[in-house]
């Protein structure tokens, strides 16, 4: 696969249909768990609580910045506010104009950027402490496993290069009752190999929240 197939031309990249699918869910169901592709509200919140736990020493409430890539309607910011985590300075970025518009309506004071992370130098030059990728690597639709893996690795390398402390992201587990062809199931050992080859070996796997997926933390 060439760089152009993944990161250019900007008008149409292999992962853009993922955004279109989420916009369809949102149009049908609105700003709730089903509108963002989740089956239950409980599972939705469990994921986002785990994303936030990438922040080490949270009890100390040290100030930090967090970049939410694929922020959607900013449900992670909803949770941050509900938990009173005022020490977190949040910024969201998304490819969908419709979802960014919804996020801005809910949080008019929020910092949201519309665009593709591969093209937005300004979000990386700010050097966020943490980068969270919420659910953008779980569904591959028509992308092959190789294409999806390449997309994920390129995005993770970009984020890890520019963050100060660490990143969090999730993928579907291989330990499931059955696998769906449109989802991205990654074995633990394969993920470990990818991380060691492209980021580092300072990582944590989280599969303790009752869903058929796992979340990965990678720290500097």
Label each PLM-derived region with a short phrase:
Residues 163-171:
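Conserved beta-strand signature within the Rossmann-like core of class I S-adenosyl-L-methionine
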Residues 119-125:
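Short conserved loop adjoining the S-adenosyl-L-methionine
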Residues 130-149:
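A short SAM/SAH-binding and catalytic strip from SAM-dependent methyltransferases
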Residues 151-158, 162:
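Short, conserved SAM-binding segment of the class I
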Residues 43-62, 79:
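Conserved alpha-helix/loop element of class I SAM-dependent methyltransferases that forms part
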Residues 1-33:
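N-terminal, positively charged/glycine-rich alpha-helical extensions of SAM-dependent methyltransferases
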Residues 67, 74-119:
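Class I SAM-dependent methyltransferase SAM/SAH-binding core
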Residues 178-220:
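Class I S-adenosyl-L-methionine
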């Amino acid at each position: 696969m060439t760089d152009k197939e993944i990161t250019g031309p900007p008008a149409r990249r292999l992962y853009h249909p993922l955004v279109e699918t989420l916009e369809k869910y949102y149009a049908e169901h609105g700003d709730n768990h089903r509108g963002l592709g989740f089956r239950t509200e409980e599972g939705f919140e469990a994921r986002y609580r785990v994303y936030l736990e990438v922040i080490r020493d949270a009890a100390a409430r040290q100030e930090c910045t967090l970049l939410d890539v694929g922020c959607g309607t900013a449900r992670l910011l909803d949770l941050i506010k509900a938990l009173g985590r005022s020490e977190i300075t949040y910024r969201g970025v998304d490819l969908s104009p419709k979802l960014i518009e919804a996020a801005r309506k809910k949080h008019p004071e929020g910092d949201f950027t519309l665009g593709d992370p591969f093209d937005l130098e300004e979000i990386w030059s700010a050097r966020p402490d943490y980068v969270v990728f919420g659910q953008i690597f779980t569904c591959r639709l028509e992308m092959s496993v190789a294409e999806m893996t390449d997309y994920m690795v390129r995005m993770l390398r970009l984020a890890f290069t520019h963050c100060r402390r660490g990143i969090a992201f999730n993928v579907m587990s291989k330990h499931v009752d059955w696998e769906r062809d449109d989802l991205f199931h990654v074995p633990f050992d394969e993920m470990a190999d990818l991380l060691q080859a492209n980021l580092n070996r300072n990582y944590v796997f989280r599969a303790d929240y009752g869903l058929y997926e796992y979340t990965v933390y990678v720290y500097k």
